[in-house]
């Protein structure tokens, strides 16, 4: 007959084995998850309206407006990443230096709303919120989200990735968005007139209820142009291999 102590030990063996296995897994996992990072942080104080340029290689760029007149740029980077900065008057250029080892740099940026913004990236999503200044974005592989904008000009070019725009259109403004491979999802106010040119090669164009008030110069399935509510700012949408979706707000 099994003794009480042996029986008790056998009852606890499965639980003890699980604890040992979990401890071993945790030890093996530590080197993989404990990759060191470095921190970049700088505050800029432009005298007038700033022009901020961010040139990244691999990583996200998040920009949001705040009510201060300073610019705060923060980034978490891999140790091998080198960030350079140049400030000439109100022109500020922050760039990730390219090297054979492509390290990651994730930017978090706060700017005055009227800052002129230029963003360049090879790989990594881009997010801009509540900005009122001109915006230029050029990326190879990024999903771009532009939310709450009130900018006079927007120019976005993406080789691979989706573009989402939700904002206002200014009188005499220019809004150009191009994705070689990706969708364009655009939301603009129903009451704002504009001139539209939408084209795609292998995708589809869906203008929703805008189509009923569009005085069209072209109604081809892959190429639609015309004036909405007598026309106004220029809205140019191009998706070579993707959909174009236009929504009212």
Predicted regions: what is each one?
Residues 1-249:
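Intrinsically disordered, low-complexity terminal regions
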